[in-house]
Structures are given as C-alpha cells and as structure tokens.
Design a protein with these regions (language model features):
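Polybasic low-complexity intrinsically disordered regions
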Residues: 1-82, 86-88, 95
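Generic, well-ordered alpha-helical scaffold segments in large soluble proteins
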Residues: 40, 69-76, 127-130, 134, ...
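A short, flexible helix-boundary coil/loop motif
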Residues: 138-139, 163-183
Length: 183
C-alpha cells in the first residue's frame, strides 16, 4: 500500500496483505483482504445461507462495490433483488435505480415492514462471525490474490454445508424417533 513514506509491507510471506481500518476500539485494524458476503434477509429455520461471496482486493470503497456484488447475486440466484439492507459503510453507493438500498441507522423513507427488515440486517453479523471462526476466514493459508478468492468462496461453501448437515442430522433424529415410536 502506498503510504506517506512509500509502499508499506504488512507481511513478508504475503505481500498482498492490506490494512483494513475497522474503527472499533477493541480491534481498530484487521490485516488481509476485504470480503463481501450476501445472504437473504428472511428469517430461516435452519439459518441463513450465504448466496454470494467475493474477495475485494485493493481496499475498494464499500459503496463502489455494491452494484457489482448485487448484479452477481442476481445472476447466481436468478431472482431480482428488490431491496438491499447494508451497513453504514455504503454511503454514496452506486446501485441501479429500481433497487432500493437501506443503510442501518437511516431514518428517511423507513417505515413499517422496511423498519422490521432493517433491524433484521444485523443477523448477517453472526454469519460473518461463524465464517471467520468456524470457516477459517480469519486466517488464509492460500497464496496470492487467487488464494484469497478461493478462501472466501470455500469458507462460504463450508458454512452452507454445515447448515445442510445440521438439517440432515435433525431429520435423521426425527426419522429414528418415529421408528422407535412404532416399535
């Protein structure tokens, strides 16, 4: 990264490492590459599936990445996205016009159902936490920019597989309980 005194090197073994300023008191900086995760906003019985993930090298501004990420999510799911709920970093986004984007903490144009759905936006924070801790998104052992992209995708795939396995385990328990009840 170009600093005041030249290029900064944050890691000898991974020169593509970047410093991401989080602005939090406990952990003000994170080192690595930005990753974008997209989930549904609906409450799901088994948990929220990750629909799209992408590593964003070069520290792009969040608002500039929104249009591309939503377009790729629409292509993957085959469904038109009507509303997007994002965090406060997406001020000045460049999303296409028919799509409505609501930021957390926004007051204008927020009422009724949208207010409920906007409160639901914070549910993705748990998904991000599980991907970082269980899915090894916090530490990447793969090399280069391509390794960053593969790590982000594999973390999301692993998270989705864990949800499916949890659902299959519950289904198997119900089947076994029904078989025991008949005996």
């Amino acid at each position: 990264k170009q600093g005041q005194r030249g290029w900064k090197l944050y890691s000898w073994h991974a020169p593509e490492t970047e410093c991401i300023a989080k602005g939090k008191a406990a952990k003000p900086y994170e080192f690595g590459v930005k990753v974008s995760l997209t989930t549904t906003n609906r409450r799901c019985k088994g948990g929220q599936f990750i629909l799209h993930t992408k590593s964003l090298p070069g520290l792009p501004y969040d608002g500039h990445t929104l249009a591309e990420v939503l377009e790729e999510t629409q292509a993957l799911t085959g469904r038109e996205i009507e509303r997007a709920y994002v965090d406060k970093g997406y001020v000045g986004h460049k999303a296409p016009k028919p799509l409505r984007v609501f930021r957390s903490g926004q007051k204008r144009g927020v009422h009724g159902q949208i207010k409920k759905e906007l409160r639901r936006r914070s549910a993705i924070e748990a998904v991000i936490g599980h991907c970082k801790s269980d899915g090894h998104l916090d530490r990447n052992y793969l090399k280069g920019r391509q390794g960053d992209q593969i790590n982000a995708v594999m973390s999301a795939v692993g998270y989705n597989f864990r949800l499916i396995l949890k659902w299959l385990k519950a289904l198997l328990c119900k089947i076994i309980a029904a078989m025991w009840a008949q005996m």
